[in-house]
Amino acid sequence: IVYFLAMSEFKIRNLNYHILFLLPGILMGLVYAKVHHVFFFLFSFYVLFNLYMNFSFDKRKLIKQIKIIIYIHVIVFMAQYIAFYTSGYVLLDYREAFGMRPLRIWNHTIDFFRAAGLYEEPNSYAVSLYMLSILYYILHRKIDYILVAACVTIFLSESLWGFGAVVIILGVVLIDKGVKLTYITLSFLSIIALLILDSELHFLFSPTTYRRFSIILTDGSFIARYGIDYQGTSMLSLFFGHGIGADGYFKSFGGNGYSAVIYYFGLVGALGFCLVFYRAAGNFIYFMAILFILSTTPMIFYFMFWIWLALIYRYNYLDKREAAKKKYFLSST
């Protein structure tokens, strides 16, 4: 009801884009999919995406709101980080009292602590700050202290995925500012090699994190998330998927977002999603930033992912297109 009321007030932009959005589900629905799962998934996220894309937000207010949210995340994270390393006290360890799963930030057995702020684990913190930072930069187009603070806390969380997230954020900013990709790649590779090989810089990481870096390909967490086992997967299922509602994607392709997309929608459906993401991004570097978020948990099943994607599309692609139209109109007149 909310959706159709909203659409009666706001003009739907780019009808061909919305039709393209339906492509993965249409193709996936031809094979094992359960009809009600397909309908719920497509309708829910299609509605949510349209609502956020078509509503007219005040850009300045949105930037301010995102900045405040990042502020809160950074302050709470640093308070937890400093509290532990100065007193040994784990701040915000309240989850068990409310019947929730305990924080997964301190391994008592090996005395390994990683701050996560308001989140259950460092990876969740890194994912949230990554999404906020990318959106903040796209809206603001400036490098300021709040963006730097976000990257620093992601780095301090010692999430292996978070290290990659910092690289992607810096890459997006530098490429957008006109720095050549070759220079950026060589610089990042040099820094990473220095951090891993130079024993004098190991103080930046805990011994556990450094050990995970040095044996990354045999790390249990890495294998569980990115290990691939094609056994039991037919060619038909590989191309068209098992359908939403099927179990076991993490057993076949690993527990990450790419695995979920391929397992549920197949390679054909995954291509459809890539077209959607590229259209929303508007350029290759933002497209890579969107794809990177799927290298962790299956974000396509989270509402916040589609809100994030819709806002990127709304303020990046559509604003550029409208600006180009105005420029053309002024030049022609």
Task: Kindly give the residue locations of the regions a language model identified.
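Transmembrane signal-anchor hairpin modules in multi-pass inner-membrane enzymes, especially those
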Residues: 1-27, 60, 64, 171, ...
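Membrane helix-loop boundary segments at the extracytoplasmic
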Residues: 25-40, 257, 285-323
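Alpha-helical transmembrane segments of multi-pass inner-membrane proteins
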Residues: 67-90, 107-111, 117-158, 164-173
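Hydrophobic transmembrane alpha-helices and their immediate junctions
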Residues: 140-144, 167, 171, 180-185, ...
